[in-house]
Every structure is written in C-alpha cells, then in structure tokens.
Amino acid sequence: MSKEKVLYGVDSTFEAVAKKATPKFKTTPGRLLFAGFMAGAFIAFGFILAIVAGCIAKYPPFAVGDTFNKPLFKILLGAVFPVGLIAVILAGADLWTGNVQFLSAAKAKRYADFKCIFYNWFGSYGGNFIGSIFLALLVVPLTHLFGQVGEPNVFGSTAVAIATGKVSKDILTLFFLGIGCNWLVNIAIWQSARVQDGAGKILAIWFPIFAFVAIGFEHSIANMWAIPTGIIASNYAITWSQFFHNVVPVTFGNAVGGFLFVAFYYWYLSHPELSTGEVIKEIVDFLVVFIVFWVVASLIPAGIGIALDKALGKGAMYLVPLILAIYYIIGAFVIYKNVKATA
C-alpha cells in the first residue's frame, strides 16, 4: 500500500494506536483494575476542580441576583475539566472510553480478538467505576469538601444540581449525547497520538475535552463520579435507579462515538484497499463484542442496582457500589482466566 493513497498520513498513527492496545489486554486483572481505578479517579479529580472553578459563576459580579451565569459556568467547567484526561494520557491509566478506540484499532489490525477486547473493556470499565465511587466518597462523607451527607455546601449543591440534570434526560437524548462526547474524547486521544512533545499533547487533549464539557455532552465514566456524588450529597434524593437510567444509554452512545467516528473512520482511511465486505464485517464484529460487553458490564449491574434500590431504598446508597465493585473484580479475574486459557 503506497503512502500516496492514504489521506492525511493517518496510517502510521493508526498503527501506533493499535499497538499501544496490546499491553492493555495482556496485563493481569489486578493491574488492569488498578489502572482503571486510577483513570476513574483522574477524571473525577478533573470534575471536582471543574465544579470548584465553575462556582465562581454563582457570585457577583458574574451572577445577577439569585441567577447564576450559566454560560460562564459551562465555560469554566470545560476549561479545567481536561486535567483528568491529560493525567490519564500523560501519567498512564486505563480509561474505558479511550479503550473503545484502542481495542477497536487492535482488532482491526488483527492484534486482538473478541476475548481480548471484552476482557480489557470489562476490567477498565469496572476499575473506572470503583475509582469514581472512591472519589465520590472522598469529597462528601470522608473529607466533607462538598459538605455533609444531606447537607451539601455550595460545591455539593452544584454537584447535586448537575446530577439531577443528568438523570432527568430521556434515554434517546442520553444516547446521542454519549455519541458526541466520546467522538470528541477520542479525537483528543487521537490528536495526542500524533504529537510527540508533552506540551503539544496537553494542547491536543485540552481543546476537544473543553468542547465536550462546555457543550454538555455525556461521558459515562465522568457520570460515575458526578451522579454518585449527587446521590450521597443529597442523602438519596437521587437514586441508583436514576444513575443507571443515565449510564446505560450513555455507555452505548460513548461506544458508538468512539468506534464509528474515530477508530473506524481512521481505519477506513488507512486502508484504501478495503472491500465493502471487509468494512461491513468490521462494523458487525464491533457490534457483537460491544453488545456482549454492554450486557455484562452495564445491563446486569443495572439490574442488580435497580433491584437493590427498589428493595432497600436509602439502605442501598452504599450497598450498591460495594456489591458492584465485588462484581467487577470477580468478573475481571474470571474473564482473564478464560482469555489466558485460550491464548
């Protein structure tokens, strides 16, 4: 394949992205879960800082009376939120929304099979959840940075308001907001892969992430911190059933956005020799592995969480994340054992 036939010279970048995925599915479940935990925590740190910065818009001279300056709030939120993904990429951690691109690229280049993708996606998604929950506990009951349980301060009240907005949207809207989000997140990751120096990578990441946050798109992993923080700070005025109402469709949308508009797009550009049949097969393969992942990593936990919520009410506030953390940890080890046995 001649380079002249490849638009924008994307073939070398796609190859690098695909190869970078290899350690992600060859690592042990303990390391994968820990790396996922760190990514969830990094994204949560970005969200925490964004709320602290955004609250400036609630006070004079930026606010008028009791009406806060919403455009300024969104701009400030977007301006500092990127520190989370910058830490994920530069420091090193495993973020599921980014792994949609990495593992899809590895599959397209035949470096990974279905089981490898499923293992990485499940482990990183579960680790992201655990890290996000830990940071939600950190800012409310453990440090009171966002106030007391049921008595949030200005930062906690803002988190509750954000969480309330997130769980109030309809499922189809959440799906499409998820597409837009991970389209931009993975463009940020793609751009950073095309830049060599650290400062350039930071800029390459910052602008797309600023855009997705300020626009108001939905990120499943960020929501794993934002909504549980709202659940705890509001003393269960927001419920786990509402959490899953958001996260399940957003996860689906994130997968479509990251795969179709980034991983698949650049694979298609990188290989002008592809036949229509090969293109269709790659899309079908993605849908198959994603649906399996979505059921096991998102729908089943949703069923568990909703059942506990209906049965226990407020008693499920801390029990749901505990049980789901155990589910993800055990699941990652079981899946890894199966992958290793067939490797």
Predicted stretch roles:
Residues 2-343:
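Alpha-helical transmembrane segments and their helix-helix packing motifs
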